[in-house]
Structure formats: C-alpha cells, structure tokens
Amino acid sequence: MIPGEIQVAAGDIELNVGRETVSVNVANHGDRPVQVGSHYHFYEVNDALVFDREPSRGFRLDIPAGTAVRFEPGQARTVQLVAYAGKREVYGFQGKVMGALEGKA
C-alpha cells in the first residue's frame, strides 16, 4: 500500500436504497446563484428557490455526501430528494421545524 492510497471494493455503491424519494421542480427567482448541500433540509432552502415546499418537508437532495447542487439565477430544474432517516428530527437551518418531523405541520 502507498501512503495516502485509498483502496475501495470493486463494484458500484448504491446510495439511499429503499428510502422514500420525491421529485420537485425548482426555479431560482433570485438574482444570485443558490447552492444547496447534500444534507440541507430542502424544505428550508433559500426563499429565492421557488417550488412546492410541503412535499420536501423531511427530505434532502439525493446526491452523494459532501456534494451540492447549484441553481443559477433564472434556472429551473427538477431535483430528486430522499427522506431523512434515523430519529427524523430537524434542528437549525431556518428554524422552521426545530424538532420531530412527524406530527407537526
């Protein structure tokens, strides 16, 4: 092994297998680019991103950890979201949830 070398198993790694997903059409109505990270609660993204937010409650982008999606001004696209797992509690971001996702609206 070479120092710093990373050895990975052969084959592809499937992400988020069996988790609930939803597709959302999103448009950036702002005058600046908006970048959203892989684990950001999509329901609470920048208000310049216009979309039906309710279906995104409890979901994040279905992309590899540590990556992001950038929305340029005036750009519209469809993104795939995946449900949060574990305790399904959300804290921080814009403070719109601050607790359990289930049983609150």
From Swiss-Prot:
Subunit description: Heterotrimer of UreA (gamma), UreB (beta) and UreC (alpha) subunits. Three heterotrimers associate to form the active enzyme.
Keywords per UniProt: Cytoplasm, Hydrolase
Enzyme class label: hydrolase
Annotated InterPro entries: Urease_beta-like (IPR002019), Urease_betasu_sf (IPR036461), Urease_subunit (IPR050069)
UniProt name for this protein: Urease subunit beta
EC number: 3.5.1.5
Keyword 4Fe-4S among UniProt keywords: no
Any Gene Ontology biological process: urea catabolic process
Cellular compartments per GO CC: urease complex
Family, as annotated: Belongs to the urease beta subunit family.
Catalytic activities: urea + 2 H2O + H(+) = hydrogencarbonate + 2 NH4(+)
GO molecular function terms listed in the Swiss-Prot or TrEMBL record: urease activity
Subcellular locations according to the entry: Cytoplasm
Organism: Pseudomonas putida (strain W619)
SUPFAM superfamilies for the chain: Urease, beta-subunit
Annotated pathway: Nitrogen metabolism; urea degradation; CO(2) and NH(3) from urea (urease route): step 1/1
